[in-house]
Design a protein with these regions (language model features):
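Conserved ABC ATPase "signature" region
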Residues: 84, 91-109, 161
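A short, flexible loop at the N-terminus of ABC-type nucleotide-binding domains that lies
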Residues: 1-12, 19
Length: 238
Protein backbone atom coordinates (compact mmCIF):
# COMPACT_ATOMS: atom_id res chain seq x y z
CA UNK A 1 0.00 0.00 0.00
CA UNK A 2 1.18 3.58 -0.68
CA UNK A 3 -0.14 6.85 0.77
CA UNK A 4 -0.11 10.29 -0.85
CA UNK A 5 -1.18 13.38 1.15
CA UNK A 6 -4.72 14.49 0.37
CA UNK A 7 -5.89 11.35 -1.38
CA UNK A 8 -6.99 7.82 -0.59
CA UNK A 9 -4.25 5.18 -0.26
CA UNK A 10 -3.45 3.02 -3.28
CA UNK A 11 -3.60 -0.72 -2.80
CA UNK A 12 -2.91 -3.12 -1.29
CA UNK A 13 -1.37 -4.49 -4.47
CA UNK A 14 -0.28 -8.13 -4.60
CA UNK A 15 1.78 -8.67 -7.74
CA UNK A 16 4.39 -11.33 -8.46
CA UNK A 17 6.65 -11.34 -11.51
CA UNK A 18 8.23 -14.62 -12.56
CA UNK A 19 11.40 -15.10 -14.61
CA UNK A 20 10.90 -14.06 -18.25
CA UNK A 21 7.25 -13.18 -17.72
CA UNK A 22 5.69 -10.34 -19.70
CA UNK A 23 2.97 -8.60 -17.68
CA UNK A 24 0.79 -5.71 -18.77
CA UNK A 25 -0.74 -3.43 -16.14
CA UNK A 26 -3.89 -1.58 -17.22
CA UNK A 27 -6.31 0.67 -15.38
CA UNK A 28 -7.99 4.05 -15.37
CA UNK A 29 -6.00 7.26 -14.90
CA UNK A 30 -5.05 7.57 -11.24
CA UNK A 31 -5.41 3.85 -10.54
CA UNK A 32 -1.74 3.60 -9.58
CA UNK A 33 -0.20 1.96 -12.65
CA UNK A 34 2.91 4.14 -12.74
CA UNK A 35 3.16 3.97 -8.95
CA UNK A 36 3.22 0.17 -9.16
CA UNK A 37 6.21 0.35 -11.52
CA UNK A 38 7.98 2.85 -9.29
CA UNK A 39 7.50 0.51 -6.33
CA UNK A 40 8.96 -2.38 -8.32
CA UNK A 41 11.91 -0.20 -9.32
CA UNK A 42 12.55 0.97 -5.77
CA UNK A 43 11.74 4.60 -6.67
CA UNK A 44 8.86 4.65 -4.16
CA UNK A 45 8.54 3.05 -0.73
CA UNK A 46 5.30 1.37 0.33
CA UNK A 47 3.48 2.72 3.39
CA UNK A 48 2.87 -0.89 4.41
CA UNK A 49 3.86 -4.28 3.06
CA UNK A 50 7.09 -5.00 1.23
CA UNK A 51 8.56 -5.19 -2.24
CA UNK A 52 10.77 -8.25 -2.67
CA UNK A 53 13.11 -8.09 -5.66
CA UNK A 54 15.22 -11.23 -6.15
CA UNK A 55 17.50 -9.43 -8.59
CA UNK A 56 20.73 -7.58 -7.94
CA UNK A 57 20.62 -3.82 -7.34
CA UNK A 58 21.15 -2.08 -10.64
CA UNK A 59 19.68 -4.97 -12.65
CA UNK A 60 16.32 -3.31 -13.22
CA UNK A 61 15.86 -1.26 -16.39
CA UNK A 62 13.22 1.50 -16.51
CA UNK A 63 11.75 3.09 -19.66
CA UNK A 64 9.73 6.21 -18.89
CA UNK A 65 6.85 7.57 -20.96
CA UNK A 66 9.10 10.42 -22.10
CA UNK A 67 12.54 9.39 -23.40
CA UNK A 68 14.18 12.01 -21.09
CA UNK A 69 17.33 12.23 -23.20
CA UNK A 70 20.12 14.71 -22.53
CA UNK A 71 19.69 17.20 -25.41
CA UNK A 72 23.38 18.08 -25.63
CA UNK A 73 24.54 14.45 -25.88
CA UNK A 74 24.53 12.01 -28.77
CA UNK A 75 22.77 8.64 -28.60
CA UNK A 76 25.87 6.76 -27.46
CA UNK A 77 26.56 9.23 -24.64
CA UNK A 78 22.92 9.15 -23.51
CA UNK A 79 23.32 5.42 -22.99
CA UNK A 80 26.94 5.30 -21.81
CA UNK A 81 27.11 8.21 -19.36
CA UNK A 82 24.75 6.71 -16.72
CA UNK A 83 26.84 3.53 -16.85
CA UNK A 84 30.03 5.49 -16.23
CA UNK A 85 28.39 7.36 -13.35
CA UNK A 86 27.45 3.99 -11.84
CA UNK A 87 31.11 2.95 -11.80
CA UNK A 88 31.76 1.19 -15.12
CA UNK A 89 34.88 2.08 -17.07
CA UNK A 90 34.46 4.34 -20.09
CA UNK A 91 35.45 1.48 -22.39
CA UNK A 92 32.89 -0.94 -20.92
CA UNK A 93 30.19 1.74 -20.91
CA UNK A 94 30.86 2.47 -24.57
CA UNK A 95 30.82 -1.24 -25.43
CA UNK A 96 27.47 -1.74 -23.72
CA UNK A 97 26.06 1.42 -25.27
CA UNK A 98 27.00 0.35 -28.78
CA UNK A 99 25.65 -3.18 -28.24
CA UNK A 100 22.37 -1.86 -26.81
CA UNK A 101 21.90 0.65 -29.63
CA UNK A 102 22.50 -2.12 -32.14
CA UNK A 103 19.94 -4.31 -30.35
CA UNK A 104 17.22 -1.68 -30.84
CA UNK A 105 18.10 -0.99 -34.48
CA UNK A 106 20.18 2.16 -33.97
CA UNK A 107 23.63 0.72 -34.43
CA UNK A 108 24.20 3.15 -37.30
CA UNK A 109 23.11 6.25 -35.32
CA UNK A 110 25.45 6.47 -32.30
CA UNK A 111 26.35 10.09 -33.06
CA UNK A 112 22.79 11.33 -33.58
CA UNK A 113 21.57 13.94 -31.11
CA UNK A 114 18.00 13.95 -29.78
CA UNK A 115 16.84 16.74 -32.11
CA UNK A 116 17.92 14.57 -35.06
CA UNK A 117 15.79 11.61 -33.95
CA UNK A 118 12.13 10.87 -34.52
CA UNK A 119 9.91 10.12 -31.53
CA UNK A 120 10.26 6.41 -32.20
CA UNK A 121 14.05 6.63 -32.46
CA UNK A 122 14.27 8.64 -29.25
CA UNK A 123 12.24 5.97 -27.48
CA UNK A 124 14.61 3.33 -28.87
CA UNK A 125 17.53 5.21 -27.31
CA UNK A 126 15.66 5.20 -24.00
CA UNK A 127 15.08 1.46 -24.40
CA UNK A 128 18.77 0.94 -25.22
CA UNK A 129 19.70 2.81 -22.04
CA UNK A 130 17.48 0.48 -20.00
CA UNK A 131 18.92 -2.60 -21.71
CA UNK A 132 22.50 -1.45 -21.15
CA UNK A 133 22.31 -2.37 -17.45
CA UNK A 134 21.74 -5.97 -18.60
CA UNK A 135 18.51 -6.18 -16.59
CA UNK A 136 16.67 -9.18 -15.24
CA UNK A 137 13.57 -6.98 -15.00
CA UNK A 138 12.53 -4.34 -17.54
CA UNK A 139 9.84 -1.84 -16.50
CA UNK A 140 8.11 0.27 -19.15
CA UNK A 141 5.73 3.12 -18.25
CA UNK A 142 3.49 3.72 -21.28
CA UNK A 143 6.49 3.89 -23.61
CA UNK A 144 4.37 4.02 -26.77
CA UNK A 145 1.76 6.59 -25.67
CA UNK A 146 3.00 9.48 -27.83
CA UNK A 147 3.85 7.41 -30.91
CA UNK A 148 1.89 6.72 -34.08
CA UNK A 149 0.34 3.29 -34.62
CA UNK A 150 2.96 2.07 -37.11
CA UNK A 151 5.85 3.05 -34.83
CA UNK A 152 4.07 1.51 -31.84
CA UNK A 153 3.61 -1.79 -33.64
CA UNK A 154 7.27 -1.87 -34.68
CA UNK A 155 8.44 -1.26 -31.11
CA UNK A 156 6.11 -3.96 -29.78
CA UNK A 157 7.60 -6.47 -32.22
CA UNK A 158 11.07 -5.32 -31.14
CA UNK A 159 10.21 -5.95 -27.49
CA UNK A 160 9.09 -9.48 -28.31
CA UNK A 161 12.31 -10.04 -30.25
CA UNK A 162 14.46 -8.70 -27.41
CA UNK A 163 12.53 -10.76 -24.86
CA UNK A 164 13.08 -13.93 -26.90
CA UNK A 165 16.82 -13.25 -27.06
CA UNK A 166 17.36 -12.32 -23.40
CA UNK A 167 16.55 -13.71 -19.96
CA UNK A 168 14.47 -10.72 -18.95
CA UNK A 169 11.05 -10.25 -17.37
CA UNK A 170 8.97 -7.27 -18.50
CA UNK A 171 6.22 -5.30 -16.79
CA UNK A 172 4.65 -2.51 -18.82
CA UNK A 173 1.87 -0.01 -18.26
CA UNK A 174 -0.56 0.80 -21.06
CA UNK A 175 -4.02 2.24 -21.67
CA UNK A 176 -4.32 0.20 -24.88
CA UNK A 177 -6.27 -3.01 -24.33
CA UNK A 178 -5.23 -4.54 -27.67
CA UNK A 179 -1.59 -3.69 -27.00
CA UNK A 180 -1.80 -5.36 -23.59
CA UNK A 181 -3.39 -8.55 -24.95
CA UNK A 182 -0.88 -8.81 -27.80
CA UNK A 183 2.36 -8.10 -25.96
CA UNK A 184 1.77 -9.74 -22.58
CA UNK A 185 1.42 -13.25 -21.23
CA UNK A 186 -0.63 -11.85 -18.30
CA UNK A 187 -2.74 -8.72 -17.97
CA UNK A 188 -3.29 -7.23 -14.51
CA UNK A 189 -6.21 -4.80 -14.18
CA UNK A 190 -6.05 -2.23 -11.37
CA UNK A 191 -9.17 -0.87 -9.68
CA UNK A 192 -10.02 2.76 -10.39
CA UNK A 193 -11.26 3.00 -6.80
CA UNK A 194 -8.18 2.05 -4.79
CA UNK A 195 -5.51 0.68 -7.14
CA UNK A 196 -5.71 -2.93 -6.00
CA UNK A 197 -5.38 -5.67 -8.63
CA UNK A 198 -8.96 -6.73 -9.35
CA UNK A 199 -8.21 -9.17 -12.18
CA UNK A 200 -5.15 -11.11 -13.33
CA UNK A 201 -5.90 -12.58 -16.75
CA UNK A 202 -3.59 -15.09 -18.48
CA UNK A 203 -3.33 -14.44 -22.21
CA UNK A 204 -3.62 -17.37 -24.63
CA UNK A 205 -1.11 -18.32 -27.28
CA UNK A 206 2.68 -18.43 -27.50
CA UNK A 207 5.14 -15.58 -27.02
CA UNK A 208 6.43 -14.06 -29.21
CA UNK A 209 3.18 -13.96 -31.16
CA UNK A 210 3.13 -15.81 -34.48
CA UNK A 211 2.48 -13.84 -37.64
CA UNK A 212 -1.23 -13.19 -38.10
CA UNK A 213 -2.10 -13.83 -34.45
CA UNK A 214 -4.11 -10.60 -34.29
CA UNK A 215 -6.62 -12.30 -36.59
CA UNK A 216 -6.95 -15.32 -34.29
CA UNK A 217 -10.23 -15.76 -32.41
CA UNK A 218 -8.29 -16.36 -29.18
CA UNK A 219 -6.73 -12.90 -29.50
CA UNK A 220 -10.11 -11.25 -29.99
CA UNK A 221 -11.50 -13.11 -26.98
CA UNK A 222 -8.52 -12.01 -24.89
CA UNK A 223 -9.05 -8.38 -25.90
CA UNK A 224 -12.73 -8.61 -24.94
CA UNK A 225 -11.88 -10.18 -21.57
CA UNK A 226 -9.43 -7.38 -20.74
CA UNK A 227 -11.86 -4.69 -21.93
CA UNK A 228 -14.66 -6.15 -19.79
CA UNK A 229 -12.40 -6.31 -16.73
CA UNK A 230 -11.23 -2.74 -17.31
CA UNK A 231 -14.83 -1.55 -17.56
CA UNK A 232 -15.73 -3.33 -14.32
CA UNK A 233 -12.68 -1.83 -12.58
CA UNK A 234 -14.07 1.66 -13.13
CA UNK A 235 -17.24 0.99 -11.15
CA UNK A 236 -16.94 3.41 -8.24
CA UNK A 237 -20.08 2.33 -6.41
CA UNK A 238 -19.39 1.23 -2.81
Amino acid sequence: MIDYPGRAPLGPLDLSVGPREIIAVVGASGAGKSTALRLLAGLERPASGAVVRPVEPGRTGFVFQSPTLMPWADARTNVALPLELSGLSAAEARRRADASLAAVGLGDRPSARPHQLSGGMAMRVSLARALSVEPDLLLLDEPFAALDSITRRGLIEDLHRLWAARSVAMVFVTHDVEEAAYLAGRVVVLSAVDGRAVTDIPMPGPLPRPEGWRRDAAYREAVEAVADALGSSMDRTP
